Amino acid sequence: MLFERKHYLNLLQNADGNGMIKVITGIRRCGKSFLLFNLFRKRLIEKGVHEDHIIQVNLEDRRNKRLRNPDVLLQHIDNMMTDTDKYYILLDEVQLVNEFEDVLNSYLSVPNAEVYVTGSNAKFLSKDIITEFRGRGWEIHIHPLSFAEYYEVVGGEKAEALEQYYKYGGLPAVAGLERAEDKQQYLREIFETVYLKDVIDRNHLKNADGLRELVRILASIIGSSTNVRRIANTFKTA
């Protein structure tokens, strides 16, 4: 399934030329990489940008491991900028680069460089990330699919589609799965290996089992009043 993400695509396009580093944030697996590397890249080409003026680096790719060195990445980008025409620098998972802030800030003074980056770790979940760019960071925050985006592609009976959306959410990968078992497995795995880990890392938590139990309790009482004191006492006596 191809979700066009028109709203966010327009935000990326409208930020072109604003003199800032465009920082695409959002929870993991919400579609940041696809938006940048597929949809936005396609739109740039449709606007007439030559492919050799789009510098695209997926830093999560093992084959690009050497580019996680900040000096090597800088040299790589500089070598690809061979004229004074505008270049679009698209970097995915930039937090994997040591001192990535310095790398990106280096291009603030380059007049023909337009920089767009994504990041997914705990640091990029913080509003403090924009301050790293000397007041010249422009955040574009991506959410999972809205129901309108979901239904535009899924179609069918609207009530049934809404029930599925409420039950499984709007992560693009989940929407593309057919079987309920596959949806549940994907969500379970991403919760355990990604979301829970991000919360633990960001807050330096030591009791992962306690956090997992807290999430289980909160998930079981959605739509009901929450007695914070009772929950706290549960953990005190555990």
What do these predicted ranges mean?
Residues 2, 147-238:
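Interdomain hinge/linker elements that couple catalytic modules in large macromolecular machines
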Residues 2-19:
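Pre-Walker A adenine-sensing motif
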Residues 24:
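Hydrophobic anchor at the beta1->P-loop junction of P-loop NTPases
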Residues 32-33:
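Conserved lysine of the Walker
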Residues 55-85:
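Short glycine-rich substrate-engagement loop in P-loop NTPases that contacts/grips substrate
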Residues 81-100:
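Conserved P-loop NTPase "ATPase switch" module shared by AAA+ and STAND
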Residues 114-120, 141, 150:
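Structural recognition of the conserved hydrophobic beta-strand(s) that form the central parallel beta-sheet
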Residues 123-139, 153-155:
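Short regulatory helix/loop adjacent to the ATP-binding pocket of P-loop NTPases
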